[in-house]
Amino acid sequence: MNIHEYQAKELLREFGVAVPTGYPAFTVEEAVAAAAKLDGEVKVVKAQIHAGGRGKAGGVKLAKTDEEVKQYASEILGKTLVTHQTGPEGKVVQRLYIEEGSAIDQEFYLGLVLDRSIGRIVIMGSSEGGMDIEEVAEHTPEKIHKEIVDPVVGLRPFQARRLAFKMEVPTKLVNEFSDMVMKLYKVYVETDCTIAEINPLVTTKDGNVIALDAKLNFDSNALYRHSDILALRDTTEEDPREVEASKHDLSYIALDGNIGCLVNGAGLAMATMDIIKHYGAEPANFLDVGGGATKEKVTEAFKLILSDDQVKGIFVNIFGGIMKCDIIAEGIVAATKEIGLDLPLVVRLEGTNVDAGKRILDESGLAITTANSMADGAEKIAALVR
């Protein structure tokens, strides 16, 4: 789950991380009122969307007067920002963050991620702050420095200092920088983050270390123990279909193809998408109904798939272990009748109660094509939608 920059900064502030003073605003009037509460000559008007690259897209403006704050707020609110992370459709700005300006001396990058290949949290730092870290990794990878955290002992202070020296943080600010690294690590662990990123982390001309921007993503599977963080969720920033899927405990991700997929198990779902591509077609979604699917859940899954106008056919690929094939078959028949499905439908069932499941499909009288294997099913649905 993602949250907005201003929410991330408020959370960082609770953990003692230094961030500039700022206030969220949902209207132009609120933006002007927020600016009036801030000290300093420069105010920063920031678009709040769940995507990076806002500055390059015109979503971050420096204002020196209240009139400029009003002007920029009027221009940005309601604007569709298109960045390298939003896709060509962009995101509509529905809220702003009005923040006091900072006298920047140097900019750095600091981020924490989980490296699944080694099963460790990795802290990354670079002197190339303010840039996309992916670009730095591609063009000047030697400027990215890493510290790997031992999960038994956690991040040690000497590692934070060592990272500071590698990044060439000014000597007089090494302790302050190291303290921020330790606090960001605490945020990452205690709130179950998947990404904790400060870009840029800046040193100021008056000798402070400040998180000028912040990005926190959280493990959705851990949100049950963070009700305060879950309350920060902004569903308007998410795909409406993914929001609807989460209500029914379905894992759904929209893709660009035309074959809807309904599968149980993430691994099988990914394999299904691969084999669809192997036969020259493109999957329209990732959809995992999980191990406890009911007829109602299958019906909701079909509705989700069909909410995508690009879908020209559906491939159901089920391996019945915990979930029984006859239950899935009943759900498929019920969903097909309720929705009035008029698209090609290929079903491959295997596992527990598979014979009963196939019998239910055969006796339904519906135009359902059955498959004997995953490859057979993928080949059939690819041929039917051509």
Curated annotation (Swiss-Prot):
<dbReference type="GO" id="GO:0042709">
    <property type="term" value="C:succinate-CoA ligase complex"/>
</dbReference>
<dbReference type="GO" id="GO:0000287">
    <property type="term" value="F:magnesium ion binding"/>
</dbReference>
<dbReference type="GO" id="GO:0006099">
    <property type="term" value="P:tricarboxylic acid cycle"/>
</dbReference>
<feature type="binding site">
    <location>
        <position position="102"/>
    </location>
    <ligand>
        <name>ATP</name>
    </ligand>
</feature>
<keyword id="KW-0067">ATP-binding</keyword>
<feature type="domain" description="ATP-grasp">
    <location>
        <begin position="9"/>
        <end position="244"/>
    </location>
</feature>
<keyword id="KW-0547">Nucleotide-binding</keyword>
<dbReference type="InterPro" id="IPR005809">
    <property type="entry name" value="Succ_CoA_ligase-like_bsu"/>
</dbReference>
<dbReference type="Pfam" id="PF00549">
    <property type="entry name" value="Ligase_CoA"/>
</dbReference>
<comment type="pathway">
    <text>Carbohydrate metabolism; tricarboxylic acid cycle; succinate from succinyl-CoA (ligase route): step 1/1.</text>
</comment>
<feature type="binding site">
    <location>
        <position position="99"/>
    </location>
    <ligand>
        <name>ATP</name>
    </ligand>
</feature>
<feature type="binding site">
    <location>
        <position position="46"/>
    </location>
    <ligand>
        <name>ATP</name>
    </ligand>
</feature>
<dbReference type="InterPro" id="IPR013650">
    <property type="entry name" value="ATP-grasp_succ-CoA_synth-type"/>
</dbReference>
<keyword id="KW-0479">Metal-binding</keyword>
<dbReference type="GO" id="GO:0004775">
    <property type="term" value="F:succinate-CoA ligase (ADP-forming) activity"/>
</dbReference>
<dbReference type="GO" id="GO:0006104">
    <property type="term" value="P:succinyl-CoA metabolic process"/>
</dbReference>
<dbReference type="GO" id="GO:0005829">
    <property type="term" value="C:cytosol"/>
</dbReference>
<dbReference type="GO" id="GO:0005524">
    <property type="term" value="F:ATP binding"/>
</dbReference>
<feature type="binding site">
    <location>
        <position position="213"/>
    </location>
    <ligand>
        <name>Mg(2+)</name>
    </ligand>
</feature>
<keyword id="KW-0436">Ligase</keyword>
<keyword id="KW-0816">Tricarboxylic acid cycle</keyword>
<dbReference type="Pfam" id="PF08442">
    <property type="entry name" value="ATP-grasp_2"/>
</dbReference>
<dbReference type="GO" id="GO:0004776">
    <property type="term" value="F:succinate-CoA ligase (GDP-forming) activity"/>
</dbReference>
<keyword id="KW-0460">Magnesium</keyword>
<dbReference type="InterPro" id="IPR011761">
    <property type="entry name" value="ATP-grasp"/>
</dbReference>
<feature type="binding site">
    <location>
        <begin position="321"/>
        <end position="323"/>
    </location>
    <ligand>
        <name>substrate</name>
    </ligand>
</feature>
<comment type="subunit">
    <text>Heterotetramer of two alpha and two beta subunits.</text>
</comment>
<feature type="binding site">
    <location>
        <position position="107"/>
    </location>
    <ligand>
        <name>ATP</name>
    </ligand>
</feature>
<dbReference type="InterPro" id="IPR013815">
    <property type="entry name" value="ATP_grasp_subdomain_1"/>
</dbReference>
<dbReference type="InterPro" id="IPR005811">
    <property type="entry name" value="SUCC_ACL_C"/>
</dbReference>
<feature type="binding site">
    <location>
        <position position="264"/>
    </location>
    <ligand>
        <name>substrate</name>
    </ligand>
</feature>
<feature type="binding site">
    <location>
        <position position="199"/>
    </location>
    <ligand>
        <name>Mg(2+)</name>
    </ligand>
</feature>
<dbReference type="InterPro" id="IPR017866">
    <property type="entry name" value="Succ-CoA_synthase_bsu_CS"/>
</dbReference>
<dbReference type="InterPro" id="IPR016102">
    <property type="entry name" value="Succinyl-CoA_synth-like"/>
</dbReference>
<comment type="similarity">
    <text>Belongs to the succinate/malate CoA ligase beta subunit family.</text>
</comment>
<feature type="binding site">
    <location>
        <begin position="53"/>
        <end position="55"/>
    </location>
    <ligand>
        <name>ATP</name>
    </ligand>
</feature>
<protein>
    <recommendedName>
        <fullName>Succinate--CoA ligase [ADP-forming] subunit beta</fullName>
        <ecNumber>6.2.1.5</ecNumber>
    </recommendedName>
</protein>
<comment type="function">
    <text>Succinyl-CoA synthetase functions in the citric acid cycle (TCA), coupling the hydrolysis of succinyl-CoA to the synthesis of either ATP or GTP and thus represents the only step of substrate-level phosphorylation in the TCA. The beta subunit provides nucleotide specificity of the enzyme and binds the substrate succinate, while the binding sites for coenzyme A and phosphate are found in the alpha subunit.</text>
</comment>
